[in-house]
C-alpha cells in the first residue's frame, strides 16, 4: 500500500500536463517542482516497500539518467495487479 501511495504521488508529475508539487526542504524552504526524481529525493519514508520504490528510482537515474517517474509508475501498476 505504501509503494502504491508513492506511485500515486508521482503519477501526476508525468506528461505534458504534469502538476507542480510543493515540498519543504530540510532547511524549511519551499521547493516547487514537477521532477519525480527531485520529489523522491526530498521525501522521507519508513516503509520498506516505499524505500524500495525510491531505490528503484535512484538506480534508474544513475544508470540511465532519465525515466525515474515512469519506472515508479510502472512498478506501482505492477504491484497493484499482483
From Swiss-Prot:
It comes from the Eukaryota. Mg(2+) binds at residue 66. SUPFAM superfamilies: GroEL equatorial domain-like (SSF48592). GO terms for cellular component: chaperonin-containing T-complex. It is found in: Cytoplasm. InterPro entries: Chaperone_TCP-1, Chaperonin_TCP-1_CS, Cpn60/GroEL/TCP-1, GROEL-like_equatorial_sf. GO terms for molecular function: ATP binding; ATP hydrolysis activity; ATP-dependent protein folding chaperone; unfolded protein binding. Its EC number is 3.6.1.-. Signal peptide: none annotated. It holds the Pfam family Cpn60_TCP1. PROSITE patterns: TCP1_1 (PS00750), TCP1_2 (PS00751), TCP1_3 (PS00995). ADP binds at residues 15, 67-70. The keyword Nucleotide-binding applies. Component of the chaperonin-containing T-complex (TRiC), a molecular chaperone complex that assists the folding of actin, tubulin and other proteins upon ATP hydrolysis. The TRiC complex mediates the folding of WRAP53/TCAB1, thereby regulating telomere maintenance. As part of the TRiC complex may play a role in the assembly of BBSome, a complex involved in ciliogenesis regulating transports vesicles to the cilia. Belongs to the TCP-1 chaperonin family. Component of the chaperonin-containing T-complex (TRiC), a hexadecamer composed of two identical back-to-back stacked rings enclosing a protein folding chamber. Each ring is made up of eight different subunits: TCP1/CCT1, CCT2, CCT3, CCT4, CCT5, CCT6A/CCT6, CCT7, CCT8. Interacts with PACRG. Interacts with DNAAF4. Interacts with DLEC1. This is T-complex protein 1 subunit gamma. The lineage of its organism: Eukaryota, Metazoa, Chordata, Craniata, Vertebrata. The gene is CCT3.
Amino acid at each position: 500500500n505504501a509503494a502504491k501511495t508513492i506511485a500515486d504521488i508521482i503519477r501526476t508529475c508525468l506528461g505534458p500536463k504534469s502538476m507542480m508539487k510543493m515540498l519543504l526542504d530540510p532547511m524549511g524552504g519551499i521547493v516547487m517542482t514537477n521532477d519525480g526524481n527531485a520529489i523522491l529525493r526530498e521525501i522521507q519514508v519508513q516503509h520498506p516497500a516505499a524505500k524500495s520504490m525510491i531505490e528503484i528510482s535512484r538506480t534508474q537515474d544513475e544508470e540511465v539518467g532519465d525515466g525515474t517517474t515512469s519506472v515508479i509508475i510502472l512498478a506501482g501498476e505492477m504491484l497493484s495487479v499482483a
